């Protein structure tokens, strides 16, 4: 296996060199390493560091006693960065023999023998057998087969990545239903749909183990969904968490959408705005998907860590922090196309909505997305007025 040395943050590792003619080089290499996910890993360092500080302030525990597991480690880069840059004990697991040997080599390269260990186990077996303060599930594809074991294992925080955005967002409807026991809709807000479907799946799995959750930070970036969930032990916390579950009624004719809380609900089929037939998505998460104060703590951690993507991280976290807690976002260009109107700057639209007495914010999902409590009819009136 031919390798090269790369550096992320303050962590140096050896990674395989993929074949030069590979269509997707990361998956063609003997051990998976995707340089495009450095942004994800930079956010992970800052978010995990922020959560560790919370844990240290709330519990009688030492930093070196906090245990983190990366269930799908491949080269080990994610877990090594947590051990070296956050300073907690990290277990890096992978079923691949090549990955297992490479992780051990990379532990030595970084001198982290006292803070890190490599394991070669089936991820579900490892997570069902051992408990960790922080469980990180970042598989290639769907995390669905591992959520039960991860929910069982996590004491304090559960971090999950999903790269199967087509099933999550409704583009592959039946696959999404099978994997997440939820009906997603492929709408203009499909990225938020995918995030809320994933959060709903996590909430249900945690509830099975008498645990609730508080989403601290969630984002949809490029081809993946990522979330950081504080785990709240106890049946009462689980029951409270499930009260944030529900459905979304969406009218494809006029763009009306409405969240309906509860797992056993009655939803009128007729759209109250235009009389068209609504479509139903869910069950999914309808509560907040980030905590503003935690976002501020993550931003503060950026100053303590030399991250190559620091400014991109800051931009994403700031947008997440400032978003309204309203499902689901609107897309300015989609509405303008429907109306035959010219699109103004997104900030002008936000200001006009606020001037009309409504709440409004941009979102991190796309550059043309916004959230507001204004009815769809009012949104259209304001867009038409702005376009002249």
Curated annotation (Swiss-Prot):
InterPro entries xref list: SAM-dependent_MTases_sf, Trm1, TRM1_arc_bac, tRNA_met_Trm1_C
The EC class name is transferase
Q: Which UniProt keywords are listed?
A: Metal-binding, Methyltransferase, RNA-binding, S-adenosyl-L-methionine, Transferase, tRNA processing, tRNA-binding, Zinc
Keyword flag tRNA processing: yes
Q: Which residues bind S-adenosyl-L-methionine?
A: 41, 78, 94, 123
What's a single GO BP term from this record? tRNA N2-guanine methylation
Keyword ATP-binding appears in the UniProt entry: no
Which chemical reaction does it catalyze? guanosine(26) in tRNA + 2 S-adenosyl-L-methionine = N(2)-dimethylguanosine(26) in tRNA + 2 S-adenosyl-L-homocysteine + 2 H(+)
Q: Where is the Trm1 methyltransferase domain?
A: 4-383
Q: What is its EC number?
A: 2.1.1.216
Which residues does the annotation say bind Zn(2+)? 251, 254, 271, 274
- Give the signal sequence positions: none
GO molecular function annotations of the record = tRNA (guanine(26)-N2)-dimethyltransferase activity; tRNA binding
Q: Which NCBIfam families does the record match to this protein?
A: TRM1 (TIGR00308)
* Function noted in UniProt: Dimethylates a single guanine residue at position 26 of a number of tRNAs using S-adenosyl-L-methionine as donor of the methyl groups.
Per the record, the similarity remark reads: Belongs to the class I-like SAM-binding methyltransferase superfamily. Trm1 family.
PANTHER family according to UniProt: N 2 ,N 2 -DIMETHYLGUANOSINE TRNA METHYLTRANSFERASE (PTHR10631), TRNA (GUANINE(26)-N(2))-DIMETHYLTRANSFERASE (PTHR10631:SF3)
Tell me the protein's name: tRNA (guanine(26)-N(2))-dimethyltransferase
User: What is the gene called?
Assistant: trm1
């Amino acid at each position: 296996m031919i390798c090269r040395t790369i550096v992320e943050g303050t962590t140096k590792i050896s990674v395989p060199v993929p074949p030069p003619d590979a269509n997707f080089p990361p998956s063609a290499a003997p051990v998976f390493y995707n340089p495009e996910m450095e942004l994800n890993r930079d956010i992970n360092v800052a978010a995990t560091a922020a959560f560790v500080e919370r844990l240290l302030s709330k519990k009688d525990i030492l930093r070196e006693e906090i245990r983190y597991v990366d269930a799908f480690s491949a080269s080990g880069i994610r877990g090594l960065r947590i051990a070296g840059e956050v300073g907690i004990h990290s277990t890096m697991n992978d079923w691949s023999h090549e990955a297992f040997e490479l992780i051990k080599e990379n532990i030595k390269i970084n001198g982290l023998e006292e803070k890190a260990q490599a394991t070669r186990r089936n991820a579900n077996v490892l997570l069902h057998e051992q408990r960790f303060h922080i469980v990180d599930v970042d598989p290639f594809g769907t995390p669905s087969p591992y959520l039960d074991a991860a929910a069982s294992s996590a004491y304090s925080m559960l971090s999950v990545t999903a790269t199967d955005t087509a099933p999550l967002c409704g583009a592959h409807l039946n696959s999404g239903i099978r994997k997440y026991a939820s009906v997603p809709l492929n709408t203009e807000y499909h990225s938020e749909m995918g995030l809320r479907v994933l959060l709903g799946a996590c909430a249900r799995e945690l509830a099975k183990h008498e645990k609730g959750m508080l989403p601290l930070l969630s984002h949809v970036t490029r081809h993946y969904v990522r979330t950081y969930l504080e785990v709240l032990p106890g049946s009462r916390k689980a029951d409270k968490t499930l009260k944030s579950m529900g459905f979304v009624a969406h009218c494809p004719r006029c763009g009306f959408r409405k969240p309906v809380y509860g797992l056993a609900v009655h939803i009128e089929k007729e759209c109250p705005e235009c009389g068209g037939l609504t479509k139903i998505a869910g069950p999914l998460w309808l509560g907040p998907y980030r905590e503003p104060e935690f976002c501020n703590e993550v931003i503060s951690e950026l100053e303590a860590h030399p991250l190559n993507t620091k400014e991109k991280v800051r931009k994403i976290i700031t947008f997440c922090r400032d978003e309204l807690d309203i499902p689901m976002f609107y897309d300015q260009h989609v509405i303008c196309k429907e109306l035959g109107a010219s699109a103004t700057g997104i900030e002008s639209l936000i200001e006009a909505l606020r001037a009309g007495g409504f709440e409004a914010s941009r979102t991190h999902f796309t550059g043309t997305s916004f959230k507001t409590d204004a009815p769809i009819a009012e949104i259209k009136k304001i867009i038409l007025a702005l376009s002249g």
